[in-house]
Amino acid sequence: MATTSYRLVVAPAGSQRSSTGNVVVTTTSSGSHSSNGANGGTGGTSAGSSTLGSGLNVTTITATSGGQLQSAGNTSQSNGTTYKIEMLEEDIQSLGSDDDDEDLISSDGSLYEGDLGSMPVNDDVAHQLAAAGPVGVAAAAAIASSKKRKRPHCFETNPSVRKRQQNRLLRKLRAIIYEFTGRVGKQAVVLVATPGKPNTSYKVFGAKPLEDVLRNLKNIVMDELDNALAQQAPPPPQDDPSLFELPGLVIDGIPTPVEKMTQAQLRAFIPLMLKYSTGRGKPGWGRESTRPPWWPKELPWANVRMDARSEDDKQKISWTHALRKIVINCYKYHGREDLLPTFADDEDKVNALISQSGDEDEDMELSNPPTIHTVTTMTPPTGNSNQPQQVNVVKINSAGTVITTHTAQSNTPAPTIIQSTNNQHVTTTATLPASTKIEICQAPAQNQQHHQHHQTHLPNAVHIQPVAGGQPQTIQLTTASGTATATAVQTTAAAVSAAQAHAHSQSQAHSQSSANQTVTAQQIANAQVCIEPITLSDVDYTTQTVLSQNADGTVSLIQVDPNNPIITLPDGTTAQVQGVATLHQGEGGATIQTVQSLTDVNGHENMTVDLTETQDGQIYITTEDGQGYPVSVSNVISVPVSMYQSVMANVQQIQTNSDGTVCLAPMQVENGDQLETITMSPGMHQMMIQGGPGQEPQLVQVVSLKDATLLSKAMEAINSGNVKSEDTIIMEQ
């Protein structure tokens, strides 16, 4: 079963736009007209669909403000806005008549007559291809021959997309030719030839022995093809010595717009462009004397094969767009914009197909007609002021993207949404009135819940509110490919306001719950915490400390003995510490951080304080010889003073439960200037607590907790404020 993809374009058919009103969806075709609609009250909707002979399904939407349906052939009313929705089926399977099938086999050259000069004058793509060399001439001739059959296909100007289409169609051709030879029993082959040395390509597959015969005739076929193309090639342009010489943007023999060049193609093309622009063999990266005057000032003069910009600049503009700006600046500086290929947009291609639909053959049918989605615009009531005000809501779902527009004013024109698909990419352009609000967010995974949550859950939302009375703004969004649908939802202004108020109340409730989690020192001191006994004998508690989580999951308490400045880090290395950082509680309950050198602590001289903490969480400890040792801190937990005072007091009374856990009994410790010295039981290290100025220094060491999550859970339970007095909390692994 073949996969079918569609392209949906919604665009105003005329330049005049009226106020929001009823919408009539009609369908036109060459020789047939079908429409269906429904009326009710002051508004109505009419929709229809048909299949053109060219495989192009066109639906026209007309918005009227008088409550009447406007037919496609009635031109007496001009107060409506007409939109066209064109769905182009990519894989169109045609079933022609028996005479046409017979003509496909028996005709000798009837499909291709004339030369490139007989092509339409407005076919800019073919003329640019023909001027690019032998490969472009061959491509232009192939396009001209396909237009003899008036198929609704256009040349793909994007090289990446063109490559994917080539591989996909070659696989389809291979399957078709083998099916043809097997079902019909005829000698048939598919020959794909690309001229132009040295990149000559010659592929042939099909029924043998005809396939082998054509393989052996490769040289003869390619020579004849080159001669035939040389006769149809346009004359080479005259060289103008007044123009600066720059290379043309030609990728694999095909002129390619700079907007559609990939990053790899741009990186390979810019050095060649610099040779023409500067006249030097090498660019001279990094030297300001060799920097061209047209090089963008915001980009570093460095090799374009790597992005040497800062992280902030990388967030502003992608590297691919920066490379495209380099190319455009060079060609504009030398006055050679004529060498930048420009092709018609997708919307222009659609309009060209629509204009040619009346002259095309009606020998094609859509095997699977596409579904036409109706776009409805609700009209705000004008007669009864008690009715709720209607809000226009237009949503476009396209591969994980939702665009919602709200128009609260009744006299505001309806938004104009233009959606174009370029194979794997969908470009959405919304032209909106100045008072329209746009919300862009990621679409939810489940479509059935989208209507319930599209107003309250807006991750990565972008809100755009233009100034009232200003000019309409255009917002362009590019996403991954997907089936594009246009729908309309009836809602009221009160419903939109209620949804916004609900989201605001939820945010306030979350902030209030976070504020209620603050606990006092009395609550912390009266809490009882049970910790697994695996590391109690290794832990020395001090008035203040910083816990750092190691890469292996352990938590290290980095502490320093004033009598021995050499410490052992968790990774086994040693370092000399020149200062001790402590925290104490100052006036008003504020926590103050101080740094004392070991000279102030134990009277040693020639010691300086040099502790540096970088933004990425690393702490640098500098030794006497000036060598810095980085200490990686991936997670820092700050513990209040009152909590550590409570824990230190509780350490004196150790209780062992039946399950092997050790409980710390609650004990209240008053905050004072004088702090006592606590001596632990045998098996525990002696611990001294440093008090105010003049007191004995604290004894500190480097210890490690084996289970980082254990202590984190206990501290989280205490800080949550849910711990009651005399309760026991047992944290299990």
Curated annotation (Swiss-Prot):
One of its GO terms (biological process) is negative regulation of synaptic assembly at neuromuscular junction. GO terms for molecular function: DNA binding; DNA-binding transcription factor activity, RNA polymerase II-specific; RNA polymerase II cis-regulatory region sequence-specific DNA binding. Its main location: nucleus. Pfam families: Nrf1_DNA-bind (PF10491). InterPro entries: NRF1/Ewg (IPR039142), Nrf1_NLS/DNA-bd_dimer (IPR019525). It comes from the Eukaryota. It is found in: Nucleus. One of its GO terms (cellular component) is nucleus. The modification Phosphoserine is found at residues 97, 110. Keywords: Activator, DNA-binding, Nucleus, Phosphoprotein, Transcription, Transcription regulation. The keyword Transcription applies. Residues 13-51 are annotated as: Disordered. Residues 18-37 have a biased composition (Low complexity). Isoform A is highly expressed in possibly all embryonic neurons and is enriched in adult heads. Other isoforms show similar expression at a much lower level. Transient expression in migrating myoblasts. A motif (Nuclear localization signal) lies at residues 146-174. Belongs to the NRF1/Ewg family. This is DNA-binding protein Ewg.
